[in-house]
Amino acid sequence: MTTDSITFNHILGQGRVNQLGGVFINGRPLPIHVRHAIISMAKKGIKPCHISRQLKVSHGAVSKILNRYAETGSISPGQIGGSPRARLTVQAVEKEILIACDENPQMSAAELRDWLIHKDICTKGNAPTVPAIKRLIGNKGVGVPKKMERKRLSYSIDSILGISIDECSKSSSDDEEGSSPSNDASSRRNRTSFTAEQLDVLENAFRADTYPHANARESISKETGLSEEKIMTWFSNRRARCRKNMPMYQQYNVQGFGSSPPSYPTLLPSPMMFLPSYSTSPQLNPLFFQHILQSSPPSSQSSPPSSS
């Protein structure tokens, strides 16, 4: 059984057949007459998929040629990317366009294209198109103020809390300057170090109420010397740590140890207990279980009492 192989008498000997039946050379650009045919068909309004089928050229090659023509106005290959000299040429043209925009921001894209041709920076054949110049100006942000004024929305957090954006940025910058010992400390997170006395006061307040009200926060602030923002942050982190450890306590309460009732509370915590409106005593507070369990951990050796 013999198979017929397709060979091409090409000087490079690299002829291949694509899925559409067209001949191409791997690593080589399409011939110039095929490129002209693609551009002329596109100008007539023919879709790229139909161009690909009629000329037997892959859809990716057709799209690449059309995109290059739309950006640079050139049909010849290697204008975008490829050799370093071509990249430097494109960068030089972009630099001239940006300089002209800075000197005369009122110039339109069509006037910039005519200016490039008049200054002999480009020719009519390789000058960038008007849409390409508009895209370059839009991407570089020429003529647009660099710092836009931030508008506070009526439903934003700043409006709800009554906090000014400028005050927040100023206070955060002041905290960074005051707490950073070195220049690169501003890139790190500012963490507050609490003393043992402050932690005792905070823990006692947390056992009494996991969501302290304004008066309680004010009294804690007077005792510890901390700001209310830091106190609220500490309580938030403390509640998160308790919620993270809560499944372990639930499993411990569900399994049980022995038939005799334990000496510590076994009430399963409910998510409703974490709400500020849920009033509970320190003994029934589920977040208080952590201190009870840490002080009297269950023994793994415990076994049910033998009936005698």
Swiss-Prot record:
The highest taxon in the source lineage is Eukaryota
Which Pfam families does UniProt cross-reference here? Homeodomain, PAX
- Where is the protein localized? Nucleus
Gene Ontology biological process = epidermal cell fate specification; gonad morphogenesis; hemidesmosome assembly; nervous system development; regulation of transcription by RNA polymerase II
Homology family: Belongs to the paired homeobox family.
A single Gene Ontology CC annotation of this entry is: nucleus
Name by which UniProt lists this protein? Paired box protein 3 homolog
Main localisation? nucleus
Described by its record, this protein's role is as follows:
Transcriptional activator. Regulates the lateral/ventral epidermal cell fate decision.
Region feature PAI subdomain, mapped onto this chain: 16-72
Name the UniProt key words of this record, in alphabetical order: Developmental protein, DNA-binding, Homeobox, Nucleus, Paired box, Transcription, Transcription regulation
